[in-house]
């Protein structure tokens, strides 16, 4: 493995987890979880439903899949020894990622096109959604370009 593979696929995930944990502790101790985002769910619900539901179902499935591979990689590798189970896992995870991506696109479109929602939108919301779209797109790209990621992810 070269430096970039070691950095992006070994070191960086651990750095992200450490920052997440320390940031959560800091935020709890210093600000008591004060949220400043304004809710937009009352302005329009139809597009919210078709964006929020697929996004959350997909992201929850992906989160627990990554958590499983992170916590018990040996059992993921044992599961993936049978080609049919490996294919089912890969296809299901890819569909969940597409569901997440399409749901977030719908939410982003709603944020930009609905005048009521746009009124309560600030630049941080837009930047965050662009970053999430980029992250999910890159995950889809890696999953499509480098097959059987659930096996090498757990190694």
Where are these regions (language model features)?
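Membrane-interface helix-loop junction between the first two transmembrane segments
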Residues: 24-43, 74
């Amino acid at each position: 493995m070269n430096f970039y593979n070691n950095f992006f696929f070994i070191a960086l995930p651990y750095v992200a987890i450490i920052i997440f944990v320390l940031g959560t502790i800091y935020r709890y101790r210093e600000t008591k979880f004060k949220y400043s985002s304004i809710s937009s769910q009352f302005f329009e619900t139809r597009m919210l439903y078709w964006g929020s539901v697929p996004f959350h179902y997909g992201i929850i499935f992906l989160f627990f899949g990554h958590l499983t591979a992170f916590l018990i990689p040996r059992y993921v590798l044992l599961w993936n020894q049978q080609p049919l189970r490996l294919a089912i896992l890969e296809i299901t995870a890819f569909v969940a990622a597409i569901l997440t991506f399409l749901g977030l696109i719908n939410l982003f479109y709603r944020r930009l096109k609905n005048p009521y929602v746009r009124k309560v939108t600030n630049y941080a919301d837009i930047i965050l959604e662009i970053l999430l779209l980029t992250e999910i797109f890159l995950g889809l790209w890696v999953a499509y370009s480098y097959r059987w990621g659930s096996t090498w992810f757990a190694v």
